[in-house]
């Protein structure tokens, strides 16, 4: 299946999709439905909240994640759970050919990266075996319904010797940072 093409800004400055394929999403599990609904809701404010929560350091961390792949320019990269496209943009700026995929149509609509986009569950990808040289994933591992199935799919779409780099949060150990983390991840 051909990925959705980001056809540039549409109404309201959001990307328009051309040649959009039918959804390749499997039947919803309860967690999948909750995760999709949450990200559809927060998509317009996601980048702002991320910048505030990380004091802007998330951009540096995303660049470091792409650099950790250690792949030459021109490599085909899959941005799994691409969201608004920060990792996709970081990879494209380093000369990679990027495709983004996300479960949330709202996040894809807010995606500002000018790369092909596909709405897909990470555990059921529509790409050929060995289609990518590298795969990046940012802040998403905890949201996958079946992490083992997702990692198996990642391995399937990576070429032999392909590389995966994931950016994820960890609980801080010091005072106010720990309190903020607990409030955000356990109450919000």
Language-model regions, residue ranges each:
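N-terminal, positively charged/glycine-rich alpha-helical extensions of SAM-dependent methyltransferases
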Residues: 2-45
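A short acidic, Gly/Pro-enriched loop at the edge of an enzyme's catalytic core
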Residues: 123-134
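Short glycine-dipeptide loop
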Residues: 73, 158-163
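A short glycine-rich, Lys/Arg-flanked "PGG" loop and its adjoining helix->strand segment in the class I
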Residues: 148-160
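Hydrophobic beta-strand segment of the Class I
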Residues: 46, 135-136
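Class I SAM-dependent methyltransferase SAM/SAH-binding core
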Residues: 76-125
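Conserved class I S-adenosyl-L-methionine
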Residues: 163-187
């Amino acid at each position: 299946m051909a990925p959705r093409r980001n056809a540039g800004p549409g109404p309201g400055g959001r990307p328009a999709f051309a040649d959009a394929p039918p959804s390749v999403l499997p039947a919803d599990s309860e967690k999948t439905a909750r995760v999709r609904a949450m990200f559809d809701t927060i998509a317009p404010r996601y980048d702002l909240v991320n910048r505030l929560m990380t004091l802007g350091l998330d951009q540096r961390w995303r660049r470091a994640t792409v650099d950790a792949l250690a792949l030459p320019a021109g490599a085909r990269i899959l941005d799994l759970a691409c969201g608004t496209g920060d990792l996709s943009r970081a990879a494209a700026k380093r000369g990679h050919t990027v495709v983004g995929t996300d479960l949330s149509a709202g996040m894809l609509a807010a995606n500002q990266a000018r790369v092909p986009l596909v709405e897909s569950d990470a555990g059921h990808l529509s790409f050929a075996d060995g289609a990518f040289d590298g795969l990046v994933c940012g802040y998403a591992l905890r949201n996958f319904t079946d992490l083992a199935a997702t990692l198996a799919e990642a391995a399937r779409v990576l070429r032999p010797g392909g590389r995966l780099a994931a950016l994820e949060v960890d609980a801080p150990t010091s005072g106010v940072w720990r309190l903020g983390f607990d409030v955000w991840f356990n109450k919000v």
